[in-house]
Amino acid sequence: MTDALKRLSDEGVAIWLDDLSRKRITSGNLAELIDQQHVVGVTTNPSIFQKAISQGDGYDQQLADLAVRGVTVEEAIRMITTADVRDAADILRPVYDNTGGKDGRVSIEVDPRLAHNTHATVAEAKQLAWLVDRPNTFIKIPATEAGLPAIAETIGLGISVNVTLIFSLERYRKVMDAFLTGLEKAKERGLDLSQIHSVASFFVSRVDTEIDKRIDALGTDEAKAQRGKAAVANARLAYQAYEEVFGTDRWAALEKAGANKQRPLWASTGVKDKAYSDTMYVTDLVAPNTVNTMPEATLLATEDHGEITGDAVAGSYERARADLDAIEKLGISYDEVVQLLEKEGVDKFEDAWNDLLKSTEAELKRLAPSKG
């Protein structure tokens, strides 16, 4: 056992857990992770809730109560998921208070079927914020083209946002622009900018998974030399973009008005390829004012044998650019890969949501009172 998680936290990395279930809440496990593993936030997504609700009996009582009331499947899902987020937010509330609202956050995602509908996404974000009714909630909005104006409008309403499914550097810059636009709207409306927080979830491991697959198809030694380099390089260049945007006069004016920076959040940090270190997407992306949301296995691996040796991003930009250029020269299109990953990301969450609808409907029918 190492003190890696403490050192990670000391380096300015907020450690969040990429998982939530009722069992994790009621068993005291979440409180234990906060107390002992330096966890200061939680992220959820449709896949996480689908897994949580379809496994075990932790939701049976609430589902039975909802079945008696005759609620729709979608109403049931919203009541179940917002209840978990609300309870997790209450457990994390002391962290929220102690960090001035920066951490102690729980994220809940808008219906992924709305990813390409700006107005419906904003309406859903407002409804979720109202339903959870906790100040330490982040509403997750995907960084699709339609999501960008929704992000700006939601921030402009004073709602804190976790922007998700970011894969490309170009899209990340647009996300930061949407965030700044939202803050400018909020300022015009007379809102307190200091109460608005945001993170931008930049996905990591999926980039290596897709690019490595294409490298393996090429099969040359030159190609194989680039395995496992794309994701970290991409994320490091994202941090460079973050430094540039939050060094502008536009940002300075908002900061003077009380605004908080939108932090980069490294998401999808579980290592899929056993050839790599199981902590590489943590140890190789240590940088000040970032968040790393980890599956529990990655969190525990980092605690056990993670080597935290200070800032791993500063001074890395030239090497990172060279790595991406070398991959492009192999004939692997960066733009094609990141566009595919965004589409697949939205599709995966939509599929998980549809599976959640089906399994919840089946449970409501099973637990409904018999007629007669």
From Swiss-Prot:
Q: Name one GO biological process term.
A: pentose-phosphate shunt
Q: Catalytic residues per the record?
A: K140 (schiff-base intermediate with substrate)
Q: Which organism is it from?
A: Streptomyces coelicolor (strain ATCC BAA-471 / A3(2) / M145)
Q: What is its EC number?
A: 2.2.1.2
* GO CC field: cytoplasm
Q: Which PANTHER family match?
A: TRANSALDOLASE
Listed HAMAP family: Transaldolase_2
Q: Which CDD domains match?
A: Transaldolase_like
* Cellular compartments annotated: Cytoplasm
Q: Which UniProt keywords apply?
A: Cytoplasm, Pentose shunt, Schiff base, Transferase
Q: Which InterPro entries match?
A: Aldolase_TIM, TAL/FSA, Transaldolase_2, Transaldolase_AS
Give one GO molecular function term. Answer: transaldolase activity
Any Pfam family matching the protein: TAL_FSA
Kindly tell me the pathway this chain contributes to: Carbohydrate degradation; pentose phosphate pathway; D-glyceraldehyde 3-phosphate and beta-D-fructose 6-phosphate from D-ribose 5-phosphate and D-xylulose 5-phosphate (non-oxidative stage): step 2/3
NCBIfam families for this protein:
PRK03343.1 (NF002881), tal_mycobact (TIGR00876)
Q: Which reaction does it catalyse?
A: D-sedoheptulose 7-phosphate + D-glyceraldehyde 3-phosphate = D-erythrose 4-phosphate + beta-D-fructose 6-phosphate
- Supply the SUPFAM superfamilies for this chain: Aldolase
Report what the protein is called.
Transaldolase 2
What the protein does comes down to: Transaldolase is important for the balance of metabolites in the pentose-phosphate pathway.
UniProt lists the family membership as follows: Belongs to the transaldolase family. Type 2 subfamily.
